[in-house]
Amino acid sequence: MTDTIEKVASTNPPTKQATRYLGNCTFIVMAWHQRLLEIKNKAQQLQGEDGEENSAYLQFFRTTISASDAAKLKRCQHMDDVAMQPAFIALWQQVEPTLIKSTANHSAYNHKVSDNAFAAWLAVAWVLSQVRTVDDRYLVASAGKSKRQLNNTLACVAGQRQDDGDRPLITPLRFEKLVSARDPNNFVSLLARMVAQLQQQGQAINVVWLANDILHWFADYQGSNYRTPKDKLTVQWSLTYYQMYSD
């Protein structure tokens, strides 16, 4: 776990489940966040080790996102503020045509992106701007004797026990408040604060899982996304959190 550029450029590929909602936007998100880390670390720029596609996205973001742009995005207090930030606009310039192309034959929105999808990507940009320490693992073993393989989602990190071994990093009350949120602004605000807290506690976060789960939540919010309660993100998060905490 590290926030160095080299770790982010790991050849460890995202799992299919971790990119279910990101789809063709996965490499866009990875390159966009990599640019934010370059700014934060003031590190030597990479030379496209993640393939030509990712390298092209990264070069675009290097020319469109400055240090002040990244700082302004991180300081946003509301999703409406995010929409006006150059760092988000650069991301959306790559995401929007990709979404339109991928949904053109499967959606009523053949020539535009839904308002819900736009809001979801505002949330992705805002929350991911809080992440400065990155974990590139997509599966992790639980801390207990069972050593069960769990998806390396935010819930998995939140459910890890603190050093004293008695409490999870995020208290059950605070976690339940997040998964009980029904309003997008409330959910995203709580999520951004939780991510910031985990980062302050020295915890690394997988940004692909995080972005994918944000899109999952907004798909659930839009309705008719799941067939059973277990398909909902909040249910999956709750199961992972308590498995990690109680194992």
Task: Report residues per predicted region.
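Basic, alpha-helical nucleic-acid-binding regions used in initiation and control of genome expression
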Residues: 2, 10-247
